[in-house]
């Protein structure tokens, strides 16, 4: 069974990272739509094999209203191998699509620079997928006030790639393993594994306080809401809550200090903010969590006043282990990403401070 542990390793990638740029831009009014000038011809490759025609066009025609896409298909203007096609037609390798001119809405800010190309540390790569070690503070995709994220930057860094799509997501503040599919078949197979809970995802989390050794399973329902600005908020609700979703986290105590505990948390369900809300609800929020944590303690930690001699300005949540079946051959793959340097430095400072206390 392939097993990548410890340092970052790469199968096929030797690219270098490009300097990061600002992640967000203020929104501006959208300009008028523009009309494509001529008929477009597209030949289907492995990246789109098996995809429905309507779904392919919705992705290919960025900025075209969904209703217009279906209207064009129904009119017969979209042709596959010179013949009319229905919206649910499955595409095959070698199919030639004839696409009529369509009116597209340009980007929200026409003067905004495109996402700067950027490579990320690669833990695993082959013809089907890429596993990267995402840094904290980087969104996985653009939206909600974020101009771009990992996927937009990766596409810019690899213009030769015909297909790059996120298999799953990580919170912006969370670092660690993130899968990107290089083929649609791989995307479908991997997302199916995630839906059926056949993957193993373990996170390293430093929490405030001393975690009780007897608490090893957290089984609490969660309810997600969106505020007027579109920001997500998650809270624990009763098991019989009409809109609550059962959420299970398995907890293993790794190391404890007087004021903090390092945990390994394996999620059996993949709810939004699951680990963060579960731990905070039990009185042990993730260190540095800006949404569910303690603001004053976060500020003290960032200023080096919580752990003497060590400033820590991020959330300590790291997706460190990921286990799944390879979409091409069913082989079990287990990947690990070591703790980022800043997290390791905080652990070392906690050890040093505890030793100093004992000596006194």
Model regions and ranges:
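RNA pseudouridine synthases
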Residues: 1-360
């Amino acid at each position: 069974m392939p097993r990548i542990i410890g340092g970052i390793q790469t199968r096929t990638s030797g690219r270098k990272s490009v300097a990061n740029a600002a992640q967000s831009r203020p929104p501006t009014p959208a300009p008028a739509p523009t009309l494509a000038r001529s008929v477009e011809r597209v030949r289907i490759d492995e990246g789109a094999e098996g995809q429905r025609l309507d779904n392919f066009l919705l992705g290919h025609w960025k900025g075209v209203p969904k209703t217009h896409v279906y209207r064009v298909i129904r009119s017969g203007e979209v042709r596959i191998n010179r013949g009319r096609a229905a919206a649910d037609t499955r595409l095959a390798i070698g199919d030639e699509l004839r696409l009529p001119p369509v009116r597209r809405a340009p980007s929200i800010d026409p003067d905004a620079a495109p996402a700067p190309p950027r490579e990320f540390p690669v833990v695993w790569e082959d013809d089907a997928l890429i596993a990267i070690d995402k840094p904290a503070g980087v969104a996985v995709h653009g939206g909600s006030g974020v101009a771009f994220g990992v996927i937009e930057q990766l596409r810019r860094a690899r213009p030769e790639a015909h297909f790059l799509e996120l298999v799953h997501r990580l919170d912006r503040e969370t670092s660690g393993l993130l899968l990107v599919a290089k083929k649609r078949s791989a995307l479908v197979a991997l997302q199916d594994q995630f839906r059926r809970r056949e993957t193993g995802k373990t996170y390293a989390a430093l929490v405030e306080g001393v975690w009780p050794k007897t608490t090893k399973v957290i089984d609490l329902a969660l309810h997600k809401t969106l505020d007027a600005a579109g920001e997500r908020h998650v809270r624990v609700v009763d098991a019989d809550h009409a809109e609550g979703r059962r959420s299970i986290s398995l907890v293993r105590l790794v190391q404890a200090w007087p004021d903090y505990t390092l945990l390994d948390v394996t999620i059996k369900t993949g709810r939004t903010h699951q680990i963060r809300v579960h731990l905070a609800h039990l009185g042990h929020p993730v260190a540095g969590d800006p949404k569910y944590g303690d603001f004053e303690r976060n500020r003290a930690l960032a200023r080096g006043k919580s752990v003497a001699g060590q400033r820590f300005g991020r959330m300590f949540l790291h997706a460190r282990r990921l286990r799944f079946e390879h979409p091409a051959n069913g082989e079990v793959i287990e990947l690990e990403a070591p703790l980022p340097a800043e997290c390791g430095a905080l652990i070392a400072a906690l050890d040093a401070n505890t030793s100093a206390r004992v000596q006194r």
